[in-house]
Curated annotation (Swiss-Prot):
Free-text function comment from the UniProt entry: Involved in pre-mRNA splicing as a component of the spliceosome. Auxiliary spliceosomal protein that regulates selection of alternative splice sites in a small set of target pre-mRNA species. Required for normal mitotic cell cycle progression. Recruits MAD1L1 and MAD2L1 to kinetochores, and is required to trigger the spindle assembly checkpoint. Required for normal accumulation of SMU1.
Region (Disordered) residue spans: 1-90, 181-205, 294-402
Organism: Rattus norvegicus (Rat)
Subcellular location: Nucleus; Nucleus, Nucleoplasm; Chromosome; Cytoplasm, Cytoskeleton, Spindle pole
PANTHER family noted in UniProt: RED PROTEIN IK FACTOR CYTOKINE IK
Phosphothreonine, modified sites: 485
Positions annotated as Sequence repeat: 342-343, 344-345, 346-347, 348-349, 350-351, 352-353, 354-355, 356-357, 358-359, 360-361, 362-363, 364-365, 366-367, 368-369, 370-371, 372-373, 374-375
GO biological process: mitotic cell cycle; mitotic spindle assembly checkpoint signaling; mRNA splicing, via spliceosome; protein localization to kinetochore
Bias kind Low complexity: ranges: 42-53
Superkingdom, natural source: Eukaryota
Biased composition (Basic and acidic residues): 16-25, 304-313, 332-398
UniProt GO cellular component terms: cytoplasm; mitotic spindle pole; nuclear chromosome; nucleoplasm; nucleus; U2-type precatalytic spliceosome
A single MF term (Gene Ontology): identical protein binding
Name of the protein in question: Protein Red
Length: 557
């Protein structure tokens, strides 16, 4: 055998003495297939003498081992590396088919992805501006070339062309797409399996004999600090719902994220105890009570201001919308439910207002009862009641022109004091408890102190107007809901002057102090009455002195 594959070799030469020109041997040399089969079937005869050879290097041993032959080993190695190289070339060719150098395509001005879209977008430009003949010709040729290429390549599954015979190009393209999709799906299926293998819990590998050991292991090695989301602080996130817009398309609220500074801190919330909560609640209630008592003492002007500042909902009549409300058929069920909810809220507000007014009326009733009891108690223990004689009206005509005429008229009218006193006692027999001398009728100090207790309790002849006095009826005053509108109720409250009995007995407390009846301005009749009392006291004194024999200075009439 040749030592190297590159060396040329030929068939062995015929041995010496071989006669080719012999016709018999020539005929014998024409062997058939049958002779070839016989030759193969006959065993080889052992050669008696070997032909001479130049070198024994190329002679094969009797027991040939291919592994020991270096040439065979070289051939095996060469064929193995040739196969690897062939596989690598095929892989590179497949990658080269899938790979596109888009940068090179952009440099060359050939971009297959955007050619069709550019042509479609530029069709309007051809009509807008009159193109040149060369540009029109080049655009038409380009379009024709694209159509021809698409026909030759078979298009795709969406845009196919009629091709004679089987469209191998399209078939190959679809097969490649299916193969790539299957490969991607397999990769996606393999990824979770790898992740599950990596995420295998080491706890499963460890064997625990007791439950306590497992819990200790979990506490030491598996304790995780929980991460808190900053958006979920108390009061951080809120929902803003637009209630004013009744015709909104959607009822989706707006999410509002407040600043951290506006949110209450966790420490401030957790440090509150039950005592602090009770104290804060008590202070709140006391502040409400304090404000309520101040609001009761508002003047009429302030009341009018407050009523002007009231929202329009408070001015609505409770029966204002009854009979006017017509439900619309075009409204959605959600709008109807919203309307019903608002109606219920208004009814609740009205009930609360009524209950508040009733409670206020009950409080006034209780106050009147207490005042009545105080008045009765005062009447029982009053020692210095006003004499009923003073309540009698006196027929006093026009005042006299001078003091002389006044004295003359008094002397003519009341000739005897005893008779006058008798008539008075007949008129009022129930005035036995009256202390006459104490009030200055027959007191010797009357001349020095003419203004006595009667003057401090001056009463006019006019009848007292008790129509404004609160009689203490059980029904109570009129409330807000006894009027049709808020304007009528406010007008009634501004003009109302219902005073309790204590005001008639003790006077009305004004801003400058309590103004009682004893400080009331006296009219003309009261002034004349007081002057008459003074003069009658002087006359009585002189009569007594004359009776005792004392000389009295007489006036000159």
């Amino acid at each position: 055998m040749p030592e190297r594959d590159s060396e040329p070799f030929s068939n062995p030469l015929a041995p010496d003495g071989h006669d080719v020109d012999d016709p018999h041997s020539f005929h014998q040399s024409k062997l058939t297939n049958e002779d070839f089969r016989k030759l193969l079937m006959t065993p080889r005869a052992a050669p008696t003498s070997a032909p001479p050879s130049k070198s024994r290097h190329h002679e094969m041993p009797r027991e040939y081992n291919e592994d020991e032959d270096p040439a065979a080993r070289r051939r095996k190695k060469k064929s193995y590396y040739a196969k690897l190289r062939q596989q690598e070339i095929e892989r590179e060719r497949e990658l080269a088919e899938k790979y596109r150098d888009r940068a090179k395509e952009r440099r060359d001005g050939v971009n297959k992805d955007y050619e069709e879209t550019e042509l479609i977008s530029t069709t309007a430009n051809y009509r807008a501006v009159g193109p040149t003949a060369e540009a029109d010709k080049s655009a038409a040729e380009k379009r024709r070339q694209l159509i021809q290429e698409s026909k030759f390549l078979g298009g795709d599954m969406e845009h196919t062309h009629l091709v004679k015979g089987l469209d191998f190009a399209l078939l190959q393209k679809v097969r490649a797409e299916i193969a790539s999709k299957e490969k991607e799906e397999e990769e996606l299926m393999e990824k979770p399996q790898k992740e599950t293998k990596k995420d295998e819990d080491p706890e499963n590998k460890i064997e625990f004999k007791t439950r306590l050991g497992r819990n200790v292991y979990r506490m030491l090695f598996k304790s995780k600090s929980y991460e808190r989301n900053e958006l979920f602080l108390p009061g951080r996130m809120a929902y803003v719902v637009d209630l004013d817009d009744e015709y909104a398309d959607t009822d989706i609220p707006t999410t509002l994220i407040r600043s951290k500074a506006d949110c209450p801190t966790m420490e401030a919330q957790t440090t509150l105890t039950t005592n602090d909560i009770v104290i804060s609640k008590l202070t709140q209630i006391l502040s409400y009570l304090r404000q309520g008592t101040r609001n009761k003492k508002l003047k009429k002007k302030d009341k009018g201001k407050l009523e002007e500042k009231k929202p329009p909902e408070a001015d609505m009549n409770i029966f204002e919308d009854i009979g006017d409300y017509v439900p619309s058929t075009t409204k959605t069920p959600r709008d109807k439910e919203r309307e019903r909810y608002r109606e219920r809220e208004r009814d609740r507000e009205r009930d609360r207002d009524r209950e508040r007014d009733r409670e206020r009326d009950r409080e006034r009733e209780r106050e009147r009862d207490r005042e009545r009891e105080r008045e009765e108690e005062k009447k029982r223990h009053s020692y210095f009641e006003k004499p009923k004689v003073d309540d009698e009206p006196m027929d006093v005509d026009k005042g006299p022109g001078s003091a002389k005429e006044l004295i003359k008229s008094i002397n003519e009218k009341f000739a005897g004091s005893a008779g006058w006193e008798g008539t008075e006692s007949l008129k009022k027999p129930e005035d036995k408890k009256q202390l006459g001398d104490f009030f200055g009728m027959s007191n010797s100090y009357a001349e020095c102190y003419p203004a006595t207790m009667d003057d401090m309790a001056v009463d006019s002849d006019e009848e007292v107007d008790y129509s404004k006095m609160d009689q203490g009826n059980k029904k109570g005053p009129l409330g807000r809901w006894d009027f049709d509108t808020q304007e009528e109720y406010s007008e009634y409250m501004n003009n109302k002057e219902a005073l309790p009995k204590a005001a008639f007995q003790y006077g009305i407390k004004m801003s400058e102090g309590r103004k009682t009846r004893r400080f009331k301005e006296t009219n003309d009749k009261a002034e004349l009455d007081r002057q008459w009392k003074k003069i009658s006291a002087i006359i009585e004194k002189r009569k007594k002195m004359e009776a005792d024999g004392v000389e009295v200075k007489r006036p000159k009439y």
